[in-house]
Amino acid sequence: MASFSSSDTVMTLATRFDNLGDWTVEQQFVLQMGSSYLLAHGIGTPLEKDATTTIEIPQDGNYALYVRTKNWTAFWSDGKTPGIFQVLVDGEADKAEFGTGKVGSTRRERAQWYWQKGGTYNLKKGKHTLALHDLMGLDGRCDAIILTKADIAPGDSIEEYKVLRQALLPEPVEDKGIFDFVIVGAGMSGLCAAIAAARFGSKVALIQDRYILGGNNSSEVRVGLGGQINMAPYPSLGYILNEIGPDRIGNARGAHHYQDWKKMDVILAEKNISLFTGYTVDGVEMEGKKIKSVTAVEATRQNRIKVSGYVFSDCTGDAHLAVMAGAETMMGREAKSQFGESLAPEKADDYTMGVSVEWYCEDWNTPCSFPDSLDWGLRLDEDTIEPVHRANWYWEVGMRDDQIADAEKIRDYGMYVAYSTFSYCKNRLAKKEDWECTHLTWVSHVSGKRESRRIVGDYILREQDLTRPIPHEDGTCTTTWRIDQHYPMEKNSADYPGEEWMSYGKLVPIDPYAIPYRCLYARDVDNMFMAGRDISVTHVALGSVRVMRTCAMMGEVVGLAANVCVSKKLMPRDIYKTHFDDLVALMKKGAGRTDVPYTQFYHQVDRTGHQAEDR
């Protein structure tokens, strides 16, 4: 079987370009499509600065150009995609427009990542230049470029791609050492876990796939904090969140609103925390039923590292670490008969709460234009349009998709709806003159997730635990949010069957409830904790525990428990069996500072249903 070799082929990763210009590094979907990539996220304005690099051609000859890309709108439209760009070789633009899509019989096939063929170039041995030139500012994307003398085309499957990468771009793994506690994911739960463990003396590795900390509460996603902290039975839990959480309420506000610097400053001040930002964990080494180490790939340079540890915590939200380690997970809705929950459906299904892709526009004094999405965008009219200036929580997509396998599609649909909505208001709305000076200021390209996989622990929290309530002897931090489940709006579902993008919340009140410790460690991976929305709960119970202040306190508990494990040479389950009093003592103390201003008074109760602020 013919294959590529470094003697006749040059492969260049887009994120490794010498100068990225105005292109954005996108690393959310490494586990689905095999790599981080460059995204032309210009929000409707073509990127001004190209991404450029210099390559070394090994020998004279004719080289065929291949570009790994995709047509991101092909899932929903047969029209010409706006996600197109050019590739320049030695300053000459290839005749092809890249990102136009794979040939296929279904929309899913046409929307897959593939190698698009360009022209053939006669190149001399030595240095040559490549450039990516965006054409629309609407999220064209490039993963890699190949120039080859070989008379074969690269395969499109993820398996073929991995083999190709290993052959042409082998990457050694740098060993970063052994830690007491390794945390994967630096959202609010991962941050609080790291801080709690570090302050009680554990050596912590905190691995985050993005360069910004905070997850959904970062300036990349912009979801406000919800839930209450500092509640009985352990009112000291939550002060860490008060240190790192923003002091302002609201979704989809300006970047400064989310005070990313507070999170980073506190983490960097902890001498026991080693922070690895931009790293996606993509592999584990097991020793029996214990995780021995994880490997991770960096988003921009795509170098690889290995991190070993004594205990680990999955704070990814998606249970990525758990799945790699072989832990049992759940996803979708459990049947009523499985746990006896009144709010569960009669039959189990794959439905989940969806993703919010936040955005907003602003009225300025200057007129502006925006590309008309009539050819490629969402089908909208005066009846279906939502002419708002801000997308809040109820702009929700992907409820019927696979939250893991379809993660990129779901995010893309959120952007697709945002662009289509704004384009309609600018170009076709009956009162479009009201939008003449309205600018689309910000559209997130990072998914604001609510639900995906949940890890099975020694106890699975159920609806009845929260509503009766049923207390447990190993209660820890307190959940206070009502059981808040989201469903597609009926009219939106009728207008866009299977592709809904508007939701409503269905609420069931609860009293404050202490989450059992047994929900915070995996049943079948001996040294793995979890904190955040991937803990051991049913779909129904997740409706309460998933909000970020509650997740943050879970992280604090897990950090304290990790310290007990490290100091007494235990595994997580051992704490429940024989050393829960040691954890209780630490939960009574908490790990947060009480000498900083207390700001977490806002949005302590669920305001689901309040939509007027966004119009």
Task: Please report, for each region that a protein language model flagged, where it lies by residue.
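Extracytoplasmic
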Residues: 2-170
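Short, solvent-exposed loop/turn and secondary-structure capping segments
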Residues: 76-79, 99, 141-144, 156-159, ...
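Flavin (FAD/FMN)-binding glycine-rich loop and adjacent Rossmann-like elements that form
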Residues: 168-175, 216, 240, 278, ...
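Beta1/beta-strand and adjacent pyrophosphate-binding region of the FAD-binding site
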Residues: 175-187
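Conserved beta-strand elements of the Class I
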Residues: 180-182, 205, 529
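Membrane-embedded transmembrane-helix bundle of lipid-linked glycan/lipid transferases
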Residues: 182-184, 285, 289, 309
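N-terminal Rossmann-fold NAD(P) dinucleotide-binding loop
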Residues: 190
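Conserved N-terminal/central alpha/beta ligand/cofactor-binding core
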Residues: 196, 202-203, 208-287, 330, ...
